[in-house]
Amino acid sequence: MLRCTVYSSDVRTAAFPLDCKKINFQPPQIQEFKLSTFNASATGVYLITVTPFKDNGDLDLASTDKMVDFCLESGVTGLTILGIMGEATKLTAEESRLYVKQVLSRVQGKVPVVVGASAPGFAPMSELTKSVMDMGADGVMVAPPSTVRTDDQICGYFDMVNETLGPDVPWVLQDHPVSTTVQMSTSVVLKILKNSPRCVMLKHEDWPGLGKLTAICQAMAKGELKKTSILTGNGGGLFLPEELVRGANGAMTGFAYPEMMVDVCRAFAAGEVERAFDIFDAYLPLAKYEQQQGIGLAVRKHILAQRGVIASSAIRKPGPKLSALDIADIERLTRRQEQKLRDLT
């Protein structure tokens, strides 16, 4: 059975570099487990995966298997599928179920699998959640719809999410204003977490959001908030080292080089903080390029295809296409990244 590295960060009381003693945080301790668990203690890297398509737009289930193997070999501690970068809104309900079934079949319980379940209404959310949980998914992820604007509307919406999902489904609160256009203040996030017994994880990707992250971690440290796993996003973890310093438990995002996030989290957990920053810096130019609004997914899929992870870089229509100049940029950044990584060894 594949062995996965799991990072346990139950205690944040000892000091470590970068003045973290001021906020009572310490890097997580590494432990080895055969299986990681999706709960409030989850740590490490939950990779947001792409959805592979054939050139004609059909689901590519063979590439799906290959992609899952690649993710597991990279050392991720979990997978999150049918997220924003997974083109979930371009799949039919039947395709979504087929894709989830394929991923779960390939993973075989080696790491937790979380499924994006955000929907315009609660009926499709309930239907998809029941379906994927019956298949063996470990939980679902929910983001607020663009129709909620006030604090009361946002909190009321998630009260209904709790009613819809019920007491047996653990779920992730996704805070990503760039995609949802919904700005959830720190106080709103805290209220949702306090009112949601089965919300075990916050996918924090507000930007700028380091202050919000610190406030939420401090609320937990003071006992004002139940223990909640906090994994961060922002495509390729653009602020991952800083977020780990502030108390994040790891990352839940996507990048064509998931081993970067795994290596950064491992180095940080081992107390090698400067090395974690050095590893991150080597990948940052390409991560930044991949984070571009509009073409970011095309960049990621192009690189994954070049790495042999998926057979085609196809994005289901409507979607962006890379120009020859875009591809030249990627090739240059990749060469420079390879040299920087050689210099690190």
In which residue ranges do the predicted regions lie?
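Active-site beta->alpha loop and helix N-cap motifs at the rims of alpha/beta catalytic domains
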Residues: 38-181
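Short helix-capping segments at alpha-helix termini
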Residues: 105-111, 135-136, 165-169, 195-198, ...
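Catalytic alpha/beta core domains of metabolic enzymes, predominantly
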Residues: 177-284, 290-292
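C-terminal alpha-helical cap/extension of soluble enzyme domains
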Residues: 46-51, 74, 248, 256-345
